[in-house]
Curated annotation (Swiss-Prot):
Motif ('KMSKS' region): 597-601
Motif, 'HIGH' region: chain positions: 48-59
Functional note: Catalyzes the attachment of isoleucine to tRNA(Ile). As IleRS can inadvertently accommodate and process structurally similar amino acids such as valine, to avoid such errors it has two additional distinct tRNA(Ile)-dependent editing activities. One activity is designated as 'pretransfer' editing and involves the hydrolysis of activated Val-AMP. The other activity is designated 'posttransfer' editing and involves deacylation of mischarged Val-tRNA(Ile).
Family note: Belongs to the class-I aminoacyl-tRNA synthetase family. IleS type 2 subfamily.
Chain's gene name: ileS
Protein name: Isoleucine--tRNA ligase
Length: 1049
C-alpha cells in the first residue's frame, strides 16, 4: 500500500490514468479475460448518428450509463458483449454532404457530382465523424470495443440486414402499393409517419372557395382550405349525410354549408347581412354535381367532370372548423385517397418529386406548390369563386433534416405489412422488462395505432433494397444476403453493396429465365438500426445469435420508444417471431437550467469538453449518473461544484486511511474478516453492517439497471457514513501508537470496505478509482476493471444496530442545536448530556451506543432515561386565548386571566392529563380546556434543550473551568493542525511547537501540554518567543496567541 497525498487533482489523475490505460492496452487485456467467461451478457449499442464530430452532452450521458452497466456486469463475472455502433446512412449524412459539395438538389447529385462520387463522400463524412466521436467517448472513460465497432454501412451489415426483407417477402408481408405519404420536395423522398415529427409555425392562406352547382343559377358549395395549391387536383366534395346543412343567401348568391358553421364562417368573413333560406340533412346533397372553378386553367380537370360530385364521408367531415364541406384531392390527402378508393374515383396528382406542378397542372406548370397558391387565389378571384381570403398561422410538418415544408403525395412505394403482426407485437411487449414501467404503455399505445411500414426511400445513401423485378414477366425476386445474390447473379457482385454499384447487378428470373433488375430505392434509415440486434454480429450472425441471443439490454432516450426500440421490436417479430430484447431501459433528455432543450441556436448549449476542462471527467460522469435515469436532467454548474466536493471527500478518506495504515505498518493480507470481527468495536460493526446493507441495495437496484440508485448509494455511503461519521469516531483510535487488537480490527474492516467500495465505484468514476486502487489496494490486479465484485454478506447486517446509529445521528444534530443555543463550541467538552427518550425500544438503542455518543457529543458523561425525566428540566407555559375566554365568560374574564397567570403549572398538568381544569372563581366553576389556553413546555433556567424524533437532548448553559480550558486547548490544537497543513507535513512527521500566550493562559497550556503533543504529533511545547518554519498570529476568543512550529529532525 502506497500512501495517497495532497488534494484531489482531477486533471492530473485523469491524464495519468488515460496514459496508463493506453500504454498498457488495459481494455484489450480486459476483453481477452472477459471472452473466456461462460455467462453471457449481450448488449447492443443504440448507434448514434455521426452527423457531427462532437457528441451532445446528452449523448455523453447515454454512453456513460452504458459504460457503467457494462463495467458492473463485467465485475459480476459475465461474458459481456460491448461492441459500439454507428448509424451511418440516411438523409442527415446526405444533406450534410450536399452542403459540403455545394449541391442544391437531388438532380445535381446525378448531373454534377455523380452518384459514385457522392456515395464515397457520404461514406468519408460518416466515418470521419464516427472516428472523432469515438475519441470523445473514449476520453470520458467508456470501455467498449472501439477497435471493432459495427457500422451500418459495412457490406457485411447490409448483407445480413437483407434477411429481414426476405423473411417479410416469404411471409407475404412485402408488396408495392399506392398511398398518400408525406414527401420532402427538397430531398425528393418520402417520409414515414414516425419520421414526421418536426413542426414549425407557418403562415398560410385560409380561403373559402365557391364550387358552382351544376344546373342551378346561383347556388354554390362552400369549401375551406389552407392549401390552395391542392384545388387544381380536386376530384369530389365530402359531407356527412347526418349533419344539418343550410342554404344561406349572401349578396344574391346561395351558399351551401353546415348549419352549425354558419355563424363562425360569416363572422370570419365579416358578413352581417345574410339569410338562412332553409335547412336539410346532408343526405340531400349526396350526388349533387358541381363545376370545377379552375377548369379553364387546368385542362386535365375537364376529364374529371363526371367525378365532381358530393359524397358521404361520415365522420371524416367535422364541424370544429371549415364549412362542413371538404374538398377532396385524392392525390394529396390520406382520407381523400381512402374515400376516393371507396367510391372508385381516380387518384389525381399533378405534382412532381420536386414539389412542382407537372404538365397536367396547366397554367401552374413548373411552379412550386406553395408559390402556386398565390396565383391560384388570384385565378379564383377572377372566376368569382373566392368567397373570403384570410391568413392562418398553424403547426405545419417540415422535413426533420432540411426543414423544408412537406407535401402529401399519392405515390407508389414498397410496404412491409406490419399490421398483420400487430397482435403478436402487443403480446411480445408484455414479455419485456420495461424500465420504467411507463415505457410499456407508451410503446403499446404506439403499436395499437400501427400502420404498414413504408420501407422504400428515393435516395442514394442507404441500404439498397434487395428487390429485383424481371423485365419480361414482372416477377419479384428478393434476396436475403450477398450469398443469396451471388447464387442467382448474372453479373459479379461488387464488394461494396451500395448504389450505384449494386444497381448494375442483374439476376436471372427464377420463373421465366429472363433478366431482372434491381429497383432504385434504398431502405428507410430506421431499417438499418432496427436490425442491429443480429446484423451487428457479423456474417455468421445465425450461429452467434444461438449462442448469445436474446439481447439482455438495450437503452436509449425516451424518444426511442417510437424510434429504435420500436424498430428493433418490428424487425424481431418479422425475423424471429419474437421481441429481440429482454430489458429496455429509458433515459431522459439533457436540458438547460431553465428546463429548455440545449441548442447552439438558443445560446444555452454546453460542450462536454468545456465541462471536462473545468471539472474533469469523473465529476461529469458522477453528476450525470446520479440523475434519475429516466427523468430529464437539468444542466447545473452548481451541481457539478457540489459533485467536486464529494470527490474531494472521497479522496481525503483514502488519504486518511492510507496514511495511518502505512504509519502503523498495517498489512491487510495477514488478516480476514473472520479473524478480526471478534475484536471489533460497535462502530466497526456498524460500518460493516452499513456497507453490506449498501451492497444489498445496489444488488437490487442493478437487477433493473438503476444506475442512479447505485451511484447515490455508493457516494452517500462513503461521504456520509464513512467520512463524516465513522472516521470522526475512529480518528483517536488511529492516533494511538500501539497496534492493539481492536485497532487492527478497525484497520482491516476499513481496508476491506474501502477496497471493495473502490472496485464497485469504478463503474461510475473509473479514473479516480483506478488511481486509488493502484495505490491503496495490496497485491492489486493490473487494473481495477479486472477485479470482481463481492456480494453482500447477510451475517454482517445488523438492522437494529443501524437504527441505533440513526438515532445517534439525530441525537448529535439535536446536541449541536442545543450547543448553538447555549453558545458552546463543539470543541468545548460538555460535563454531562441528558437524553430523554419516548419508548423502551429507543432507550435500549441509545444505551447500546452510549460510548459512541460520548465521543460524538464530546461529553464527559451521558445520562439516558425515559421522557418523563424531562419534567425535572422543564416548566409549563400557559398562554390564555383571550378572545375565547372573553366571549364565553364576559365580565369574569379579568379574574380568569389572573387565575391562569398564577396557576399555570396545575392548569397545564390537569389539561394534559384530564383534558380539562376546573377553577373555582367567585363561587363559580370555570372549566378550562385547550380551547381556552395554549400550553407549551419550556426548559428551566440554566439549561437548553433540543428535540429529536424520539426524544429530547438537554445540556447546561454553564461550563466548568476545566471544560473551558479544554475548549481553549482544542482551539489551539486546531490552529496547529492548520499550520501543519500549510507546511504540507506528512502525518508521520513530528513537530516542535512554540507558543506566546496571554500570561493568564500559560498555566493552562502547561497543564495540557501532553494532550497538545498527542493531538498534533508534537514532541516539544515551548512557551515563549515563537519560532519555526512557520509562525502565525491567531485571535482565539478575543485573545492574541502567536504560534510557531517546525519539523523535528
Amino acid at each position: 500500500m502506497k500512501p495517497l497525498t495532497g488534494n484531489y487533482d482531477p486533471k492530473k489523475i485523469e491524464d495519468e490514468i488515460i496514459s496508463f490505460w493506453e500504454e498498457n492496452k488495459i481494455y484489450n487485456k480486459l476483453r481477452d479475460i472477459v471472452s473466456k467467461r461462460r455467462e453471457k451478457f449481450l448488449f447492443i449499442d443504440g448507434p448514434p448518428y455521426p452527423s457531427s464530430p462532437t457528441p451532445h452532452i446528452g449523448t455523453i450521458w447515454n454512453k456513460v450509463i452504458k459504460d457503467c452497466i457494462l463495467r458492473y456486469e463485467r465485475l459480476l463475472g459475465k461474458k459481456v458483449h460491448d461492441q459500439p455502433g454507428y448509424d451511418t446512412h440516411g438523409l442527415p449524412i446526405e444533406v450534410a454532404t450536399e452542403r459540403l459539395l455545394g449541391i442544391l438538389n437531388k438532380q445535381e447529385i446525378i448531373d454534377k457530382i455523380g452518384v459514385e462520387n457522392f456515395i464515397n463522400k457520404c461514406k468519408e463524412f460518416a466515418l470521419s465523424n464516427a472516428t472523432k466521436m469515438t475519441q470523445n467517448f473514449k476520453d470520458v472513460g467508456v470501455f467498449m470495443d472501439w477497435e471493432r465497432p459495427y457500422y451500418t454501412l459495412d457490406p457485411s451489415y447490409i448483407s445480413s440486414s437483407w434477411s429481414v426483407i426476405k423473411k417479410a417477402y416469404e411471409k407475404g408481408m412485402l408488396d408495392k402499393g399506392t398511398a398518400v405519404l408525406h414527401w420532402c420536395p427538397r430531398c425528393e423522398t418520402t417520409l414515414s409517419d414516425y419520421e414526421v415529427s418536426e413542426y414549425r409555425d407557418l403562415e398560410d392562406p385560409s380561403i373559402y372557395v365557391k364550387f358552382k352547382i351544376k344546373g342551378e343559377e346561383n347556388r354554390y358549395l362552400l369549401i375551406w382550405t389552407t392549401t390552395p395549391w391542392t384545388i387544381p387536383s380536386n376530384v369530389f366534395v365530402m359531407v356527412n349525410k347526418d349533419y344539418d346543412y343550410a342554404d344561406v343567401e349572401v349578396n344574391g348568391e346561395v351558399l351551401v354549408l353546415a348549419k352549425d358553421r354558419i355563424e363562425a364562417v360569416m363572422k370570419e368573413a365579416s358578413i352581417t347581412n345574410y339569410k338562412v333560406l332553409r335547412t336539410y340533412k346532408g343526405s340531400e346533397l349526396i350526388g349533387v354535381k358541381y363545376k370545377h372553378p379552375l377548369r379553364d386553367f387546368v385542362s386535365a380537370q375537364t376529364k374529371l367532370d363526371d367525378f365532381h360530385q358530393v359524397v358521404d364521408a361520415g365522420n371524416v367531415v367535422t364541424l370544429t372548423d371549415g364549412t362542413g364541406l371538404v374538398h377532396a384531392a385524392t392525390g394529396h390527402g390520406e382520407e381523400d385517397f381512402l374515400i376516393g378508393q371507396k367510391y372508385g374515383f381516380p387518384v389525381v396528382m399533378f405534382v412532381n418529386d420536386r414539389g412542382e406542378f407537372t404538365e397536367e397542372g396547366g397554367k401552374y406548370k413548373g411552379l412550386k406548390v406553395r408559390d402556386a397558391s398565390k396565383v391560384i387565389i388570384n385565378d379564383l378571384k377572377s372566376k368569382n369563386a373566392l368567397f373570403f381570403e384570410g391568413k392562418i398561422v398553424h403547426r405545419y410538418p417540415v422535413c426533420w433534416r432540411c426543414k423544408t415544408p412537406l407535401v402529401l403525395r399519392a405515390i407508389d412505394q414498397w410496404f412491409i405489412r406490419v399490421t398483420k403482426i400487430k397482435d403478436e407485437m402487443l403480446k411480445e411487449i408484455e414479455n419485456v422488462n420495461w424500465i420504467p414501467d411507463w415505457g410499456k404503455s407508451r410503446i403499446s399505445n404506439m403499436v395499437k395505432e400501427l400502420r404498414d411500414w413504408v420501407i422504400s426511400r428515393q435516395r442514394f445513401w442507404g441500404t439498397p433494397l434487395p428487390i429485383w423485378i424481371c423485365e419480361k414477366c414482372n416477377n419479384v425476386i428478393v434476396v436475403g444476403s450477398r450469398e443469396d445474390l451471388e447464387s442467382i447473379a448474372i453479373d459479379s457482385v461488387p464488394n461494396d453493396l451500395h448504389r450505384p454499384w449494386i444497381d448494375n447487378v442483374r439476376v436471372k428470373c427464377n420463373k421465366c429465365g429472363g433478366v431482372a433488375k434491381r429497383i432504385a430505392d434504398v431502405a428507410d434509415v430506421w431499417f438499418d438500426s432496427g436490425v442491429a440486434f443480429f446484423a451487428s454480429l457479423g456474417k455468421d450472425w445465425q450461429e452467434k445469435w444461438k449462442e448469445l441471443g436474446p439481447v439482455d439490454l438495450v437503452l436509449e432516450g425516451h424518444d426511442q420508444l417510437r424510434g429504435w426500440f420500436f424498430s428493433l421490436l418490428r424487425s424481431g417479430l418479422i425475423l424471429l417471431d419474437k421481441a429481440p430484447y429482454v430489458s429496455v431501459l429509458v433515459h431522459g433528455f439533457m436540458l438547460d437550467e431553465q428546463g429548455r432543450e440545449m441548442h447552439k441556436s438558443l445560446g444555452n448549449y454546453v460542450e462536454p469538453s468545456v465541462v471536462i476542462q473545468r471539472y474533469g471527467r469523473d465529476i461529469l460522469r458522477l453528476w450525470l449518473l446520479r440523475n434519475t435515469t429516466w427523468e430529464d436532467a437539468r444542466f447545473s454548474w452548481r451541481a457539478l461544484e457540489l459533485t467536486k466536493r464529494d470527490l474531494q471527500i472521497i479522496w481525503n478518506t483514502y488519504v486518511f486511511a492510507s496514511m495511518y495504515m502505512n504509519l502503523d505498518n498495517f498489512e491487510p493480507v495477514k488478516y480476514t474478516l473472520d479473524d478480526v470481527i471478534k475484536y471489533a468495536k460497535i462502530e466497526d460493526l456498524w460500518i460493516l453492517s452499513r456497507f453490506n446493507s449498501m451492497l444489498k441495495k445496489v444488488n437490487e437496484s442493478m437487477k433493473n439497471y438503476k444506475v442512479h440508485e447505485m451511484a447515490n448509494y455508493l457516494i452517500n455511503f462513503l461521504v456520509e457514513d464513512v467520512s463524516r461519521f465513522y472516521i470522526r469516531l475512529i480518528r483517536k483510535r488511529a492516533w494511538i501508537e500501539a497496534n492493539t487488537q481492536d485497532k487492527i480490527a478497525m484497520y482491516y474492516i476499513l481496508y476491506f470496505i474501502l477496497k471493495q467500495w473502490i472496485i464497485l465505484a469504478s463503474t461510475i468514476i473509473p479514473f479516480i478509482s483506478e488511481k486509488i486502487y493502484k495505490s491503496f489496494v495490496v497485491n492489486p490486479k493490473e487494473s481495477v476493471s479486472m477485479e470482481s465484485s463481492i456480494n453482500y454478506d447477510e451475517r454482517f447486517i445488523d438492522n437494529e444496530l443501524e437504527r441505533a446509529f440513526e438515532v445517534a445521528r439525530e441525537i448529535n444534530e439535536a446536541s449541536l442545536n442545543a450547543r448553538a443555543k447555549a453558545g458552546i463550541k463543539l470543541r468545548w467538552p460538555l460535563a454531562k448530556v441528558y437524553i430523554f427518550v419516548e419508548d423502551e425500544d429507543t432507550l435500549a438503542k441509545v444505551n447500546r451506543i452510549k460510548d459512541v455518543l460520548l465521543s460524538l457529543l464530546n461529553a464527559k458523561d451521558i445520562e439516558i432515561s425515559k421522557i418523563e425525566g424531562f419534567k425535572s428540566f422543564s416548566k409549563y407555559k400557559v398562554e390564555p386565548n383571550r378572545s375565547i375566554i372573553g366571549k364565553e365568560y364576559k365580565s369574569m374574564s379579568p379574574k380568569i386571566l389572573d387565575y391562569i397567570r398564577n396557576n399555570s403549572d396545575i392548569i397545564a398538568i390537569d389539561i394534559l392529563n384530564k383534558k380539562q381544569h376546573v377553577a373555582r372563581i367567585d363561587n363559580v366553576d370555570v372549566i378550562l380546556n385547550t380551547s381556552h389556553v395554549i400550553i407549551s413546555e419550556e426548559t428551566i433556567e440554566g439549561y437548553v434543550s433540543s428535540k429529536f424524533a424520539q426524544g429530547i437532548v438537554v445540556i447546561s448553559k454553564e461550563i466548568s473551568e476545566s471544560e473551558e480550558e479544554e475548549g481553549l486547548v482544542r482551539d489551539i490544537i486546531r490552529r496547529i493542525q492548520f499550520m501543519r497543513k500549510q507546511l504540507k507535513l506528512n502525518v508521520v512527521d513530528y513537530i516542535e511547537i512554540s507558543i506566546k500566550a496571554p500570561e493568564e493562559r500559560v498555566k493552562t497550556i502547561q497543564k495540557w501540554e501532553e494532550f497538545i503533543k498527542s493531538e498534533t504529533r508534537g514532541n516539544k511545547v515551548i512557551l515563549g518567543d515563537p519560532k519555526g518554519d512557520i509562525v502565525m498570529d491567531w485571535d482565539i476568543e478575543g485573545e492574541s496567541y502567536i504560534i510557531g512550529i517546525k519539523k523535528s529532525t
